[in-house]
A protein has these predicted regions:
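A short, amphipathic beta-strand motif
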Residues: 24-31, 55, 90
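Short, ordered, surface-exposed loop/turn motifs in non-cytosolic proteins
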Residues: 24, 31-45
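Surface-exposed, low-complexity/disordered segments
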Residues: 88-220, 270-388
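Extended beta-strand-rich segments in extracellular/periplasmic secretory proteins, especially
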Residues: 198-257, 290
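Short Pro-Gly-centered beta-turn/loop motif in secreted/extracellular proteins
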Residues: 34-37, 58-65
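A short, solvent-exposed loop/turn motif at the edges and junctions
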Residues: 44, 68-78
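Bacterial Sec-dependent N-terminal signal peptides
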Residues: 1-27, 388
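Short, acidic Ser/Thr/Gly-rich low-complexity loop/linker segments typical of extracellular
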Residues: 47-56
Length: 388
């Protein structure tokens, strides 16, 4: 069987350590339920980070101020100095609003968000510092892990035409590939592909979707759900927008596969193999930079499940991307492109910096990842690919 490549377009934080910076490591939970708060934003005028699945974050900055916020909760404004005297766990207070209690007017808030796009989002060249994690699983088992720290330069945030250039600063990768011509494989997309997707589908064609009446989240945010007008259209997603009613900026978006149409998704057929995407989930969170007055995608998550058959054997691939932007408008003059953005992610070659990865504390390897890396892999069956 010929080698077949399944290609699809399909975030944990970190800020590089530097001298004379303040350091903060805490857990963030709901004050009432004590549940960990995932993807809450911690920032000041210079730096950004977010909490992980356990509500944990590590924040570095030379600026003493700290703002901690999450939709539906009271914002906490404090300092590194003040937080250094607190316990390891911080509590956010839920705002006294119920999501489904208040339904507002018929004003087309979606159209207002579209009308304000050119003022809310950067429309001129800018550079962002980012971290990106990619994980690939085959039938529930890890096969590839890749972490990046780097910078991206683009002409504008939305509607870009793959006019990206990249400066990768650090990379850590480990993976296995089956040997032999009967091997099936999964081709992870390029940096261009990943950022192209995040740049181009923040907005939807209103002609193709039904939008719900807006519902109040808090005094500044409304939620609008959407569904495709054609219930049988498997190519259209379901999801929601959360929009700031002060400036009509999109603050959060969910875009996912409609479970009612999965059975309609056809297979792509090639010699000896057929495959299809059976689940897709994307979540974008945007923040406003205080200095520039523009919004940027601070945190994005993409999870994709691909089902394939090699003969009678069913294979399920799960690929996930996690992105966080730590410096949304960094120094344009210091940007130096050093990699080909069109090259498949796992084929990029950047030397491993042991000191960086062992001290950054922001993209830690999970126990599952460590077990995968340390596990003996049969050299007759697998080819190990690693830069460390």
């Amino acid at each position: 069987m010929k080698k077949n490549i399944i290609a699809i377009l399909t975030y944990i934080t970190l800020i590089p350590l530097s001298f004379s910076q303040n350091t903060l490591s805490k857990y963030l939970v709901d004050k009432e339920t004590k549940a960990p708060l995932k993807s809450a934003t911690i920032h000041n005028a210079n730096d950004y980070t977010v909490t992980n699945d356990d509500g944990h974050f590590v924040f570095y900055s030379s600026n003493d101020s700290v703002t901690i916020k999450m939709l539906g909760y009271e914002t906490l404004k404090t300092t590194f100095k003040a937080l250094s005297r607190t316990k390891d766990t911080l509590y956010l207070i839920p705002k006294p609003f119920q999501l489904d209690e208040v339904t507002l007017s018929n004003k087309n808030i979606i159209q207002e968000a579209y009308n304000h796009a050119s003022t809310n989002y950067p429309m001129e060249p800018f550079v962002e510092d980012f971290f990106l994690r990619c994980i690939l699983k085959r039938n529930g088992e890890l096969v590839k892990i890749e972490d990046f720290s780097g910078r991206i330069k683009r002409d504008k945030l939305l509607g870009a035409e793959k006019n990206f250039t990249f400066q990768l600063l650090n990379m850590r990768k480990f993976g296995i590939e089956k040997k032999g011509v009967r091997a099936d494989d999964f081709n992870i997309p390029s940096l261009n592909d990943v950022f192209q997707w995040w740049s181009n589908i923040l907005f939807l064609n209103q002609e193709n979707y039904h939008f719900s009446r807006p519902k109040t989240i808090d005094e500044q945010h409304q939620k609008i759900e959407y569904t495709p007008k054609s219930e049988d259209d498997y190519q259209k997603s379901i999801g929601y927008f959360i929009i700031n009613t002060d400036d009509y900026a999109i603050k959060e978006r969910i875009y996912k596969t409609n479970p009612k149409t999965i059975h309609k998704i056809p297979y792509t057929k090639k010699p000896f193999i057929k495959y299809r995407t059976i689940d897709y989930y994307c979540k974008d969170k945007l923040e406003k930079d205080a200095k520039k007055g523009k919004y940027f995608i601070a945190n994005a998550i993409v999870n994709v499940k691909v089902e394939g058959y090699v003969g009678e054997e069913r294979i399920v691939y799960d690929v996930s991307f996690e992105l966080i932007v730590t410096h949304p408008f960094s120094d344009l003059s210091t940007f130096k492109a050093n990699v080909n953005g069109k090259k498949e992610l796992f084929k990029l070659d950047v030397p491993y910096n042991k000191e960086f990865w062992e001290t950054q504390n922001q993209l830690p390897l999970t126990n599952e990842m460590r077990d995968f890396i340390n596990k003996p892999h049969n050299p007759k069956e697998y080819r190990v690919i690693s830069n460390f």
